[in-house]
């Protein structure tokens, strides 16, 4: 069966139609927020009991209040359920992700001499408690467990936990449990969706209250994070998957088709565009996509064909390559792959993207699993202001200052004038003769 891949000719679109291409499926959260509000309130009031009820209602799982936390026996069982080769691949991925994030770690403290005797710097300490949210709705995602848990451990977070929806059997995905153990997290809880976010925001008898939650999720999860942002830090905005493959006229259309399908297969709420100024490449890629659908599971074909036939996906054909670049920067994609014989020539032109992958040997799928950089990336245009998940999401910095007497005498006169100009007498007094007198009086007492 041949599926339609929509070609959007940018020059033929009105401003309204162009803006529609830039919108994401989760842009309007109003309906989700109305659904999520009572769920949050129920968890706040009833804790574990509410989590057990929602496991049955939403996950079709029987999870009693004393089964919310994964047991050691469940961890042990997970290793018997996952193929040894898969465990080796999980370990391989963890090693690569760990190396990247270890290289990303800043010095614990640095100080610079600003003026003679004036020293200032930063000191980094880990956030006390962070929850890693691992989605499950459209499959199992041990890769997300790796991407969220590894930097937590590298950063030294004292309380790092995983929350994830249970399957219909009341158990957590086995590969996710294997990852948790390999990484060094032994606290995993069976609570997903908005109820999981509420649980770590308020804490329950079983689930610890956390300072921050990281990880992607459904619009229900995104809505819950938005509503609870004053109580728990919601982390990098990470909604449904999205990608752009930017291809010039030197690119291989079959590779463009292969890589376009990577993010499109995540679900019907994904967004995926091939953006090019080459009509020939666009048409050849359109044919190739239908060929590659023959090698995919029916469910993934349904997901990706839905995406590529609507306004959230397909092929964007521009008049010039510069126009293609402009569209990419306006879109600010989660993933952006540049296909060109000279990808580095185009790298500097891209200013808005969660990640930029270069060339035909760097497919999005490798970046998602084994390359090293974090694959939890800003979505919904957040890449215009936000960054990929990193060790810095698990750290907080505190400014450090120290003055010698020489440094104090250097800065005090300027500080005094500043304070008097702004009308702060106590500020001015603290750097006036009153300070010198206070120091002298202390010496006399001693």
Swiss-Prot record:
InterPro entries in alphabetical order: Ald_DH/histidinol_DH, Histidinol_DH_CS, Histidinol_DH_monofunct, Hstdl_DH
- Active site, renumbered: 334-335
Q: Which PROSITE patterns match?
A: HISOL_DEHYDROGENASE (PS00611)
**Cofactor binding note of this UniProt entry:** Binds 1 zinc ion per subunit.
Q: Which residues bind Zn(2+)?
A: 266, 427
Q: Which GO terms describe its biological process?
A: L-histidine biosynthetic process
Q: Name one Pfam family in it.
A: Histidinol_dh
**What general EC class does the enzyme of this chain belong to?**
oxidoreductase
Q: What's in the GO CC field?
A: cytosol
> In terms of domain of life, where is this protein from?
Bacteria
Ordered alphabetically, the record's keywords are: Metal-binding, Oxidoreductase, Zinc
**Co-factor(s):** Zn(2+)
Recorded GO terms, molecular function? histidinol dehydrogenase activity; metal ion binding; NAD binding
CDD domains named in the record? Histidinol_dh
| Entry EC no(s) | 1.1.-.-
The record's similarity note reads: Belongs to the histidinol dehydrogenase family.
Which NCBIfam families does this one have? hisD
What PANTHER family would the database entry show? Answer: HISTIDINE BIOSYNTHESIS TRIFUNCTIONAL PROTEIN (PTHR21256:SF2), HISTIDINOL DEHYDROGENASE HDH (PTHR21256)
Instruction: Give the protein's recorded name.
Output: Histidinol dehydrogenase homolog
Q: Which organism is it from?
A: Colwellia psychrerythraea (strain 34H / ATCC BAA-681)
